[in-house]
């Protein structure tokens, strides 16, 4: 069964593949007092690939809250931004996470994975999309590059609540990362979202400092901070003397202003930034309407 490949013609507006019995979904669960309630259905994705340890930690943290469906890229799409694949077909195959959890892997981008699920690849209604856990912070303008964040953005475009979760280890950390704190915080955020809901065009960008949970000072709701990029153009020559280029440089820094995501993490706090899809520069709107646009 695991070698079955689903062929998804790109550009279809609606399509449906019946995956039963691959990912059975319980429709009714029970509260602690024995009353029936509807079980929520969460789609989990990421940009590091379906085999990434951060995704596994997230799935394990959320598995007792809701029915979980995993649909993630089959390889790393870090810094891919918001992608919609329109000029080639997308393929999806069944796989297993390291703990044996069934999952689906696509050769599309993170935002493609969310679109596939919402447009019919997953039969059951999805209530929430959670993307992560990314092994690096997504702070300030990082959100425009991040496949983790733009997967959540894709859900918000379709009117679904969504959460992107990233861990922010300091530069130079060696060896496998410990995702336990970030996974626990992700669960806490998801519990609040399931309880309160989110406005239709809003999603959350969550960043967690690389600290034991006991050392986390708290949770702050923040605005985006100012990220400072130190990119460099690196020129190389191939064996035939033809130039090629890498975009490289040092890791970005940020301005830890009070009330920002960067400032929160610098102070040992979890940052939760509500984000929306309207990129209009509201402060400039009326001013620019007063310009002499019709002047000869």
Can you annotate each of these PLM segments?
Residues 5-23:
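Hydrophobic alpha-helical signal peptides and transmembrane signal-/tail-anchor segments
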Residues 42, 53-125:
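A cross-family phosphate/adenosyl-ligand binding-site feature
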Residues 177-296:
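Electrostatically charged, flexible surface regions
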Residues 156-178:
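Glycine-rich phosphate/pyrophosphate-binding loops
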Residues 117-123, 150-161:
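Alpha-helix C-terminal capping segments
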Residues 22, 26-39:
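Short, Lys/Arg-enriched N-terminal segments with co-localized hydrophobic residues
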Residues 137-146:
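Glycine/threonine-rich flexible loop motifs
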